[in-house]
Amino acid sequence: MRSNRAKSRAVVSMAATLPMLAGALALGIPAAHAADNPGRDSLAGTKPAWATAKADKGATSNGSQVSLRVYLAGKDASGLAAYAKAVSDPNSAAYGKYLSAKQVQARFGATKAQVAAVKSWLTSTGLKVTGVTQHYVSVTGDVAAAEKAFSTQLHNYAKGAKTYRAPSKSASAPDSLNGAVLTVTGLDNAPHKANHDDQLPGPTAVFKNAGPFSSYYGSKTATSLPSAYGKKIPYAVQGYTGKQLRAAYGAGKYTGKGVRVAITDAYASPTIAFDAATYAKKHGDAKWKTGQLHQVLPGNYTNTGADECDASGWYGEETLDVEAVHAVAPDADVTYVGGASCFDDDLLDSLSKVVDNHLADIVSNSWGDIEANQTPDLAAAYDQVFQLGAVEGIGFYFSSGDNGDEVAHTGVKQVDTPANSAWVTAVGGTSLAVGKGDKYLWETGWGTEKASLSADGKSWTAFPGAFTSGAGGGTSKTVSEPYYQKGVVPNALATANNAAGNRVVPDISAIADPNTGFKVGQTQTQADGSESYSEYRIGGTSLASPVIAAVQALAQEARGGKAIGFANPSIYAKYGSKAYHDVTDNPTGSGLAVARVDFANGYDATDGLLTSVRSLGKDSSLSAVKGYDDVTGVGTPADGYVQSFVKPKGHR
């Protein structure tokens, strides 16, 4: 279940494409002088691709109000990107030479003089400064003042069935600021939110799984149901536990001791401490120590309604993330950083809190949106935070999405964001088979096709059925191919959208299929209106991301506690080794499927049962093949992965 940075962002025109994030923006560098506007520096990417002449519906009223964030470039934006790369590259002399948060701010942050100059410019145009952080200056005002400040005209544009405001040309800033401005967000008012990637309903109402179940893969065969792929198939597992996942991914003796993991989502579950403690006790996980689970929360929440961000729907996301990390890395410290809403500005604030205060070395993020909805100005703001984190030795892990190639969901083949950033680790998903005695059997790329049981119970209707969900992946249309993917990612994938090569997602993977999912425990509203703790099986790349974050905590412990930092160069350096399970869609040589029984009403048998067959390894147009692929990346952690971080005796 992955939290989408915005359910309502699906109203965008799916035909929209974004300019390539190359050169200045890709590195977080302020754009060059505007040739058509002397004395101004263009802020590239501030005019959305959907703001076309054909869609133009006329000028926005001068009196309309705007709320903007002017992001600061800092003293040395190009130097920040270069240092972030060097400190993360195992082949660099600077590898692992991280800076403290204070050192990062002193070396790369905006100076007091830069901030003062930006504030002076903004107020001189009639905008009102409403807040200042080390990353941005927030302002409000009317359209006329914004147009004056950024030397552009704001028009209304048709975007799908909606109308939104946007600049008619790229915004700019005075060149007298000497590049102090990175970008500005808020000139366009299309929704910028995230969705969580859960595959099951949120905790507002109870959800329970019906049986029969397998306790491990294949333990209970559906003998009374029709065959699939020429054989009887097992019932879906009840939900794997931490013990099974630790065995599958080679945890060994490591527990994440001494390692700090952060989780970002929107809002905060009011019952997380109780739920996490109850779950750990019921499933044999280590008891949470006093102070081991922290929460860093905003003073106020916004956009909480069901038609906005649906705050309660995010509670299950936090629950899954916290319980999954603790199940796999039971001694790691966990800090949950909640956003004030599911909008990008608030999620960026959460990420910045982690970096500015170095709350953790490993950050799991189970939320995102489609690439067509991310504008380059936001991408620049995100990348700046990711680069600052890399310099401190902080790595960010993002779920790759739950809709496969997104065609069934949006009508357009595309990847998700921020997982598409070259500065984060995109985590894809698999279907996992753990057998008797916690033995790893196999994995497939996660992609599900569903067919229902016929009325007479003798066949599966229209077998194998329709695509329901699967790991997000594919080739970005906006992000250039990063150096660490060259030589590993097949050329056919890298050049799918551009002969010069683009970023391909994901980088690495873990369990995600809800049909081979993880059991979680959460306080839910029961059918009678009471609230009580109950458990259910869940999946999505929302599960894969915290599992990989937890495995990274084990790896960091194995290397003596030294931060792994931005992990992609290291992940690709281990490609083709015993560190990974090389996942394919057909690991057993024949079709794979499980039988699943669900309550029709989602919680009990009052309204009957629904029986279906779920075929595995059917991820839309994406395929898990031998070697790197766009479903699972380099693969999943094998027994050799954590062990590969152990330094030989005598090695310093």
Where are these regions (language model features)?
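An often Trp-containing, charged/polar helix-loop segment at the C-terminal end
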Residues: S8, Q556-G627
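Tryptophan-centered motif/residue detector
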Residues: W314, W367, W442-T448, D456, ...
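Long, domain-scale functional regions
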Residues: A544-S545, S577
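Polar, glycine-rich mid-to-C-terminal structural blocks
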Residues: N420-K477
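Secretory targeting and sorting signals
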Residues: M1-A35
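Substrate-binding/charge-relay-adjacent region of secreted/lumenal peptidase catalytic domains
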Residues: A35-G131, S138, V143-G429, S469, ...
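Helix N-cap / loop-to-helix initiation motif
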Residues: Q114, A544, F599-Y603
